[in-house]
Regions:
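Conserved N-terminal subdomain of the carbohydrate kinase-like
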Residues: 2-107, 111-119
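Conserved phosphate/ATP/ADP-binding segment of small-molecule kinases
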Residues: 120-178
Length: 178
């Protein structure tokens, strides 16, 4: 494990123990060699009535280009909250290239909860996340995200069989494990 190189692609939240601020210390303590690529600087979690998101798309583009030029390798990539359509395309293309080389790709398609997309997340994100899932070894959508990705209606309750069918539908998008 000490030589396992993990690239975490997610937002950095100023107020709240989520995303990179939660992942970095835990995975570092576990002995992984952690590298991070912040997709945004976020003032607080999106469930508050007011927040600010600082877009880092250009930073992401430049960093990935430099890292590829320098030959940096990763054993696994984990994606989380991605802010813009352009950033999603850049990260998806990078993950597809790396997956072809054997890098494991973990996708948390963070885009909504409680039956709707998060504030500021456009509908077009759904299609872009579907493309990212095509190269995913592991996908961890919540119920809302799984329904949005598979064009299924969001229900108050589902049966175990409906839950399994939803997982299978996400798997049909390309994710090897859900």
């Amino acid at each position: 494990m000490k030589n396992t190189q993990l690239l975490l692609i997610n937002d950095m939240c100023g107020y709240g123990k989520v995303a990179l601020s939660a992942m970095l210390p835990v995975l570092s303590h576990m002995g992984y060699r952690i590298h991070n690529l912040p997709t945004a600087l976020v003032s607080d979690t999106l469930n508050y009535p007011k927040f600010y998101i600082h877009d880092t798309t250009e930073y992401v583009r430049q960093s990935l280009a430099i890292w590829e030029e320098l030959g940096f390798e990763f054993d696994a990539i984990s994606t989380g909250f991605i802010v813009t359509e352009e950033e999603t395309r850049i990260i998806s293309d990078f993950c597809h290239r790396r997956a072809q080389k054997g890098t494991k790709v973990f996708v948390d398609p963070i885009m909504g909860d409680n039956g709707k997309l998060y504030a500021g997340v456009p509908e077009s994100t759904i299609g872009l996340m579907r493309h990212l899932l095509e190269c995913a070894d592991y996908a961890v959508p919540n119920y809302t995200e799984a329904c949005l990705l598979t064009d299924r209606p969001i229900a108050e309750q589902i049966t175990p069989d409906e839950g399994r069918a939803l997982v299978d539908a996400v798997r049909e998008l390309g994710a090897k494990s859900v």
